[in-house]
Amino acid sequence: MATNTTEVKAIARFIRISAYKVRRVLDQIRGRSYREALIILEFMPYRATEPILKVLRSAAANAEHNAGLDRTQLVITQAYADQGPPLKRFQPRAQGRAYQIRKPTCHITVAVGAAPEK
């Protein structure tokens, strides 16, 4: 039995926030409907919600424009954050030394698809 499932995704790369912090927000919206996820993200107190909202809206726009799907019928099928390359900075220390500071980045991927027919 072959099922024709259309899945459309959007990716935000090199976001200046730790993947660990983004994952705790993505875990809350994975598997939910598009509208429900928007409401959840609007009222979460975390800084990671801003780039996730942007990627989610982009995925919905891609689904509407490229695949002809209806936004009201969308469900988040995949949502994950991969680690990106760290930004390396230096902190001056005493006696001419310098400590390296690694600022984390991540890549956020959100995929949406049509809700299964009941």
Curated annotation (Swiss-Prot):
GO terms for cellular component: cytosolic large ribosomal subunit. SUPFAM superfamilies: Ribosomal protein L22 (SSF54843). It comes from the Bacteria. Keywords: Ribonucleoprotein, Ribosomal protein, RNA-binding, rRNA-binding. InterPro entries: Ribosomal_uL22 (IPR001063), Ribosomal_uL22_bac/chlpt-type (IPR005727), Ribosomal_uL22_bac/org-type (IPR047867), Ribosomal_uL22_CS (IPR018260), Ribosomal_uL22_sf (IPR036394). It holds the Pfam family Ribosomal_L22. One of its GO terms (molecular function) is structural constituent of ribosome. The keyword Isomerase does not apply. CDD domains: Ribosomal_L22. GO terms for biological process: translation. The keyword Cell division does not apply. This protein binds specifically to 23S rRNA; its binding is stimulated by other ribosomal proteins, e.g. L4, L17, and L20. It is important during the early stages of 50S assembly. It makes multiple contacts with different domains of the 23S rRNA in the assembled 50S subunit and ribosome. Part of the 50S ribosomal subunit. Belongs to the universal ribosomal protein uL22 family. This is Large ribosomal subunit protein uL22. The lineage of its organism: Bacteria, Bacillati, Cyanobacteriota, Cyanophyceae, Nostocales. The gene is rplV.
